[in-house]
């Protein structure tokens, strides 16, 4: 266990010399936005669902733009390869746990999502201890998109009724009302199914990495 942790710390130390380019700054900002999201959800100020919706939407946008900018400008770094998916996992798991605390999501769904993300994170840490970097796969990226869509849809579901007069003036209630009641639960199911399936596939494809230590 000590060698495992030591290998990971050594890996991070070696990569700490990488300059904080724009994609990496966006990745780090996702950690900050996630903390702010959790603070709002659990403090429950007035219109907290809408505030949480705005914070999570911005966090989701950083996930899109950090990868896009990194690929476009050739700014892909080992730091980004490791920390970008980690930021995604913390963001998503935090949201699902917060939803569980609010009574919005069944416990078994949260268990599947959190267990999957912890398992994949553990696999990446194991790879890091061996000086290997496991990049996210396409199926995993689709999974992350489905999770973000599901979380935003659930936040819309629980916030749009608060919009009252403003919602009627700007037509938001008309825009969201007809579909959010069925789309949010459906997107949640899709996200959980993709989360479980992508996790099984990722663990199977990289089985040699952890089976070698058994």
Annotated model-derived regions:
Residues 35-37, 83-96, 143-153:
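Small-residue-rich segments of transmembrane alpha-helices in multi-pass membrane proteins
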Residues 33-82, 95-111, 178-193:
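Membrane-embedded alpha-helical segments that form the functional core of polytopic membrane enzymes
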Residues 32, 61-69, 86, 90, ...:
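Active-site His/Glu-centered metal-binding helix of metallohydrolases
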Residues 81-133:
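Helix-adjacent hinge/juxtasegments
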Residues 40-44, 100-101, 126, 156-157, ...:
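Helix-loop junctions at the membrane-solvent interface of multi-pass transporters
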Residues 2-27, 33-34, 53-60, 132-214:
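C-terminal membrane-associated helical module and adjoining short loops/tails
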Residues 31, 54-57, 86, 111-114, ...:
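Residue-level signature of the transmembrane alpha-helical core
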Residues 20-23, 66-88, 131-143:
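Juxtamembrane helix-capping/reentrant segments at transmembrane boundaries
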